[in-house]
From Swiss-Prot:
Domain F-box residues, every copy: 143-194
Gene responsible for this protein: COS111
InterPro entries according to UniProt: F-box-like_dom_sf (IPR036047)
Protein name per Swiss-Prot or TrEMBL: F-box protein COS111
Function: F-box protein probably involved in ubiquitin conjugation pathway.
Length: 726
C-alpha cells in the first residue's frame, strides 16, 4: 500500500476523480450485460431475493473490476479478458490512463527514450534562436540601439563631454561612435611639442580624410625641449650666445627626432639622451666628435652585441665579469620571440618603462615623478644642441594647410620657421624622331599626386619629409646610356663623354609659398600671424588684397574675416602690423598707401587742391570735407594664373563724424568696379579704430599742409582777381 499511495500522490489526477470515472464506466457495462443475459429461473430468483445467495463464479467482470486490478494488471481470468478487450479496442482504459501514472515501467521507458533521442543543449539553443528570429516574430519592433542615433546627435553628445580623455574613450564604443569622435577630436587641434606636429603631419598624409575634420589649427603654443621650467627663462640667453651654450643632459624630442626615426644613427634608442651618464664634457666639438665612444649608455636598454661587448671590455677588462656578461648577452640574444617582443614593447613605448626609471634618478636636475608622467620620448644625443629651439620646417606648415581644406581658424603667432626645400623629381623625354643623339628636355614630376611609392612608403614631397641628407638629392643622377660628343672633338668617337643628368631638383620654399597655401583656404575666417619676424609687409599686403578680392568675387561680406598681424615684421610699428576685420585692414592699407607711397602731386590732383586762376571768388573746400578721386591711379594688382586683376580705388571721402564716433564703410560699385571708402572721423572705440584714426589724421594733416602751401604761393593772384571784381 505504501507503493500505491506514493503512486497515487504522483498522479496528475486525484483518486476521487478516477473513482468517479471508473464507476461511470461500470454502470454503462452493467446495462449492456443486463440486456444480453438470459432470464433466470424461479429458484434462482428466490435465492437472490432472500439475500443468502453466495455467488461462486470467479468471473467478476459483470460486476466491474477494481481500480487496483485495472491499474496494475493482476493475473486473473477477468483481468486477462479485460486486458485483451482493451488491447483490441482503440481507447482502452489502461492505454488512456497509463500516461498519467509516473511510477509505471512504461512511463520510465518512454522517458528514457525521449531523453536519449532529445537534442543537445547547443542544438536546443540554436532551435530557440531560430524560433525567436522566425518570420512570425519579425513583425515585432526591436528596441532602438544607441548606434541608431543620427550622426549630428552623436557628435553633439561627444562635444558636450568637455573632457579630452572621455572623448578619446568614445573611439572604442562602436564604429559609428568612432567616426563621430574623430570629427570632434580633430576639429580643434593644438600642439605644444614639435614632435607631435611631425606625427600629425604623417598621419594626415597617410589618411587624408582626417584632414577634412580639422577646422582650427593652433601652433602658437609650441615649447622647446627643455624639461626644467627654469630653463625656459634662459631661452633668450641661449639663443643669443650659441658658442658658449652647453646643451642639457636630457631633453624632450622634437621634429628632427621624428624625421630621422628610421635612421640607424639618429633614430637609435640606444643614443637617447636619457641613457647618458653625467660625464663632464670639455667642449662641444670634442663631445660631438667622440660622443659615441666617450659616454656610457644604459646597459639594460641596449640590444646591440658590439656595444655590450665593448662596454664590458672597457669597464672590466681582464676580469671574470666579462665572461659572465658575454654569456648573459648570448642567452638574451637566443631568447624566444615572445620574450623579445615584450622586451621591445617595453623599451619602444612612448612613455617610460621600468628600466628607464633607473636612469631618471641621476638625470640633471629632473624629477622622477615628472618624467614618469611625461608621454614624450627623449631626444637623440646629437640633437641636444637644438633643444632650445621651437621651430618648424616650412614644409610641415604647407602640408597642414594643404591637407586641412576646411580650416576656419589659423594661429601661427610666435612661430619660428626652419628653411625647407621642395623636392622635384626630373624626368627626361625625347622630342621628335628617334636618333642616336636625341635632344633631351626636362620636365617636372609632381610628387604630390603619388603619395606612396612602390614599397608603400610615403613619397617625400619636401626635404623635411625625408631622412636622407642634402647631398643625396643634390648629387643623385640617372643611369643613362646616352652619350654626347665632345664639342672640341666631334669626329673622334673615343672622346665621347657621358652627360650627367640630375634625378632630383631642390627648390627653396619662401613666404610666397606659405601665402599661397593660406589663400587657397576657402573657409578661412580667422588668421593670426602676430609676433613673427618672417612675415614681411608685402606679405601682409598680399594677404589683405587677395582676401578682399575673393570676398568680392564670391559676394561675401568683409566683416566675416578677422586678421591679426600685430607685432610682425622686421621693423617696429609697421603701418599694416595691426589687427581687425578685413574691412578695417583694407582701409588701413589704402590710407597707408595714400600717406606714405604717394607723391605731393598725386595728393594735389586727387583732392583737387591745385590753384586754377579765375575771375570769380575762389571757393576753397570746406574744412570738414575732404574728397579724393583717385580713379585709376590708386589700384592693387592681384596676380593670378590666367591674368592679373586690378582692384581700383575710386573715391575716398573723409568727413567729421556726426555721432562723435569713428566709423568707416567700404563699398564696391558693380558697374565701374571701383572701391568707395567713407570715413567719419571721430573718437575711436577699439584698438583698430585707434590705428585707423592715427593714419587718417596723418593723411588729413598732409592734405591741409599742401592746401596751405598752394594758398601761400598764389595769394597775390587770388587777391588781385577778387579785388578787381569787387
Amino acid at each position: 500500500m505504501g507503493k500505491t499511495n506514493k503512486n497515487r500522490i504522483k498522479t496528475g489526477i486525484s483518486y476521487r476523480s478516477l473513482h468517479l470515472l471508473i464507476s461511470a464506466n461500470e454502470t454503462v457495462k452493467e446495462k449492456r450485460e443486463a440486456e444480453q443475459l438470459p432470464a433466470l429461473d424461479n429458484d434462482t430468483q428466490c435465492l437472490m431475493s432472500t439475500g443468502k445467495v453466495h455467488i461462486l463464479n470467479a468471473d467478476y467482470s459483470r460486476y466491474g473490476v477494481s481500480v487496483y486490478d485495472k491499474l496494475y494488471g493482476y493475473s486473473s481470468s477477468a483481468a486477462s479478458t479485460i486486458e485483451e478487450e482493451d488491447k483490441g479496442s482503440g481507447d482502452g482504459f489502461k492505454k488512456r490512463y497509463m500516461s498519467l501514472m509516473q511510477g509505471s515501467s512504461q512511463w520510465k521507458s518512454r522517458k528514457l527514450k525521449q531523453k536519449k533521442n532529445a537534442p543537445k543543449a547547443s542544438a536546443k539553443a540554436k532551435a530557440f534562436l531560430v524560433r525567436l528570429h522566425s518570420e512570425k516574430r519579425r513583425h515585432e519592433v526591436d528596441f532602438a540601439d544607441i548606434n541608431c542615433l543620427p550622426e549630428e546627435i552623436i557628435c553633439r553628445i561627444i562635444a558636450n563631454l568637455n573632457d579630452a580623455d572621455s572623448q578619446r574613450n568614445c573611439l572604442l564604443v562602436s564604429q559609428e561612435w568612432s567616426e563621430c569622435a574623430k570629427r570632434i577630436i580633430y576639429k580643434d587641434v593644438k600642439f605644444t611639442s614639435t614632435y607631435r606636429v611631425g606625427q600629425f603631419v604623417t598621419t594626415l598624409r597617410e589618411n587624408p580624410q582626417y584632414g577634412k575634420y580639422v577646422e582650427s589649427l593652433d601652433l602658437s603654443q609650441l615649447k622647446n625641449g627643455f624639461i626644467n621650467d627654469e630653463s625656459s627663462t634662459l631661452e633668450n640667453d641661449v639663443s643669443q650666445s650659441s658658442y658658449g651654450f652647453e646643451p642639457p643632459d636630457i631633453a624632450y624630442a622634437g621634429w628632427r627626432d621624428w624625421r630621422y626615426r628610421k635612421n640607424s644613427l639618429y633614430g637609435s634608442e640606444m643614443l637617447s639622451s636619457i641613457h647618458r651618464s653625467r660625464t663632464r664634457r670639455s667642449s662641444d666639438a670634442s663631445s660631438m666628435n667622440s660622443s659615441v665612444f666617450s659616454h656610457n649608455y644604459n646597459r639594460t636598454r641596449s640590444s646591440s652585441v658590439t656595444s655590450l661587448v665593448s662596454r664590458s671590455t672597457q669597464t672590466a677588462a681582464g676580469s671574470k665579469n666579462v665572461v659572465k656578461r658575454i654569456r648573459k648577452l648570448f642567452s638574451n640574444s637566443f631568447r624566444g620571440k615572445g620574450q623579445q617582443k615584450t622586451h621591445l614593447h617595453q623599451n619602444n613605448g612612448s612613455g617610460l618603462s621600468t628600466l628607464e626609471l633607473k636612469d631618471e634618478q641621476f638625470a640633471a636636475g629632473t624629477d622622477s615623478c615628472s618624467l614618469r608622467r611625461s608621454h614624450l620620448p627623449f631626444t637623440n644625443k646629437f640633437f641636444l644642441k637644438y633643444a632650445h629651439l621651437r621651430d618648424l620646417p616650412l614644409g610641415y606648415i604647407i602640408h597642414l594647410l594643404t591637407l586641412c581644406v576646411n580650416l576656419k581658424s589659423i594661429n601661427l603667432s610666435n612661430l619660428s620657421l626652419s628653411p625647407d626645400f621642395e623636392i622635384e623629381e626630373l624626368e627626361y623625354k625625347r622630342n621628335g624622331y628617334v636618333s642616336f643623339f636625341p635632344e633631351e628636355t626636362e620636365e617636372e614630376n609632381l610628387n604630390g599626386l603619388n603619395t606612396f611609392n612602390g614599397d608603400r612608403e610615403l613619397t617625400p614631397k619636401f626635404f623635411s619629409d625625408s631622412d636622407k641628407p642634402y647631398h643625396y638629392y643634390k648629387d643623385t643622377q640617372y643611369e643613362s646610356i646616352i652619350w654626347k660628343l665632345d664639342s672640341s672633338r666631334d669626329n673622334n668617337m673615343f672622346t665621347n663623354r657621358r652627360r650627367s643628368r640630375k634625378k632630383f631638383q631642390l627648390k627653396i620654399l619662401t613666404n610666397d609659398d606659405l601665402c599661397e597655401a593660406i589663400l587657397s583656404l576657402k573657409h578661412m575666417k580667422h588668421l593670426n600671424v602676430g609676433n613673427v619676424v618672417w612675415l614681411m609687409q608685402r606679405d601682409m599686403k598680399r594677404l589683405i588684397v587677395h582676401s578682399m578680392e575673393s570676398c568680392i568675387i564670391e559676394d561675401r561680406c568683409l566683416d566675416k574675416i578677422y586678421m591679426n598681424f600685430e607685432g610682425s615684421g622686421l621693423q617696429t610699428n609697421l603701418p599694416l602690423a595691426g589687427q581687425g576685420l578685413l574691412k578695417a585692414m583694407v582701409l588701413l592699407q589704402v590710407i597707408t598707401d595714400m600717406t606714405n607711397n604717394c607723391s605731393d602731386d598725386q595728393i594735389l590732383e586727387w583732392f583737387e587742391l591745385r590753384w586754377i586762376p579765375t575771375f570769380r571768388r575762389v571757393s576753397q573746400p570746406a574744412d570738414l570735407v575732404y574728397l579724393a578721386r583717385a580713379c585709376d591711379q590708386l589700384h592693387y594688382v592681384i596676380q593670378s594664373e590666367e591674368s592679373p586683376t586690378y582692384t581700383r580705388v575710386g573715391e575716398v571721402l573723409i568727413t567729421e563724424s556726426h555721432t562723435g564716433h569713428y566709423k568707416y564703410e567700404i563699398s564696391r560699385n558693380v558697374n565701374n568696379v571701383y572701391l568707395t571708402i567713407q570715413i567719419e572721423n571721430g573718437k575711436p572705440d577699439t584698438i583698430t579704430d585707434v590705428k585707423l584714426k592715427e593714419c587718417s589724421d596723418r593723411l588729413l594733416e598732409r592734405v591741409s599742409n599742401l592746401r596751405k602751401n598752394q594758398l601761400l604761393q598764389h595769394t597775390g593772384e587770388n587777391f588781385f582777381s577778387t579785388a578787381g571784381l569787387a
